[in-house]
């Protein structure tokens, strides 16, 4: 079977919007090539510049790629894609390119930019096909994203992992809502959490996260559920993680105290810069005290504590 690779050129603020459109079209997953993010990792000596072609490093804005199977409905999907891109609340309408790829190329296209990355002081993330031996005793997570979001090289994920390094001391209970690949749930378990609930609405994400949980040997600690975010969390926990988007965080915030212990931590991420103040106000109105704010490019993450 042949596939059509669709590459959408979009500003950083539109990456998640375009990803959601592809999900609606049935792509199942996306590849994000963000030159600003890649160059930050190169400057930090995490990645080597020779691993990336100049056209990627010098690109003026990110590209979001997806792969759709050729078939009778493909042209209709492309028309719908153009309509949805035109309707996005962005300063400029994203443009897209298309090219045919063979099945064997499609199956591995997303793998070439997924490299081992060290995060914070204690953690490292590697794909299963890369050799990596930590020199400083880091805890290594082996993650294959498949068709789910979150493999450790996106700022929203990285900032959450850095917060978890500081607050997981051992024995905590954690709820990860919108778990994606399960990376934050697995991070919590490997740092010493005693019990972790990982929830996602997406059945593909649930499947991928369960595979990653087993790959990392934490299936006795992490339970993965398919469900509506907080609905699956029945008892109070020490930490709640929500690496989603600003709108969903603000909807979730009033319900988080129901399942979070007093003095417990709420980590939020996936917040674009221009929504950060709005999210902060909502968190404080709900009874949270902001303990920390991290920024990375266009993204913001908050560490909060439930007072009372």
UniProtKB/Swiss-Prot annotation:
Gene3D superfamilies: Vaccinia Virus protein VP39. This is Ribosomal protein L11 methyltransferase. The gene is prmA. Its EC number is 2.1.1.-. Belongs to the methyltransferase superfamily. PrmA family. The keyword Acetylation does not apply. The keyword Transmembrane helix does not apply. It comes from Desulforamulus reducens (strain ATCC BAA-1160 / DSM 100696 / MI-1) (Desulfotomaculum reducens). Methylates ribosomal protein L11. Keywords: Cytoplasm, Methyltransferase, S-adenosyl-L-methionine, Transferase. It comes from the Bacteria. Its main location: cytoplasm. It catalyses: L-lysyl-[protein] + 3 S-adenosyl-L-methionine = N(6),N(6),N(6)-trimethyl-L-lysyl-[protein] + 3 S-adenosyl-L-homocysteine + 3 H(+).
């Amino acid at each position: 079977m042949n596939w059509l690779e669709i590459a959408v050129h979009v500003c950083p603020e539109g990456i998640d919007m375009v990803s959601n459109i592809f999900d609606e079209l049935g792509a199942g997953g996306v590849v994000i090539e963000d030159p600003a993010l890649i160059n930050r990792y190169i400057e930090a000596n995490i990645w080597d510049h020779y691993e990336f072609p100049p056209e990627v490093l010098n690109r003026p804005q990110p590209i979001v790629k997806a792969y759709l199977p050729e078939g009778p409905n493909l042209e209709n999907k492309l028309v719908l894609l153009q309509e949805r891109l035109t309707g996005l609340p962005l300063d400029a309408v994203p443009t897209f390119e298309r090219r045919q790829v063979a099945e064997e190329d499609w199956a591995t296209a997303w793998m070439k930019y997924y490299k081992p990355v060290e995060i914070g002081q204690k953690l490292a993330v590697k794909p299963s096909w890369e050799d990596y031996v930590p020199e400083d005793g880091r805890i290594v997570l082996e993650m294959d994203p498949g068709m789910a979001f979150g493999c450790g090289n996106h700022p929203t994920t990285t900032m959450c992992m850095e917060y978890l390094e500081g607050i997981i001391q051992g024995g905590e209970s954690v709820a990860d809502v919108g778990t994606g690949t399960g990376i934050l749930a697995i991070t919590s378990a490997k740092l010493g959490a005693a019990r972790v609930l990982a929830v996602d609405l997406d059945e593909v994400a649930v499947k991928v996260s369960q595979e990653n949980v087993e790959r990392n040997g934490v299936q006795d600690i992490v339970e993965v559920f398919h469900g509506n975010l907080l609905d699956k969390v029945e008892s109070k926990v020490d930490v709640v993680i929500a690496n989603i988007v600003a709108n969903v965080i603000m909807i979730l915030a009033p319900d988080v105290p129901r399942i979070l212990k007093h003095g417990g931590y709420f980590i939020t991420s996936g917040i674009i810069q221009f929504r950060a103040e709005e999210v902060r106000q909502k968190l404080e109105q709900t009874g949270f005290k902001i303990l920390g704010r991290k920024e990375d490019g266009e993204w913001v993450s908050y560490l909060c504590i439930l007072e009372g």
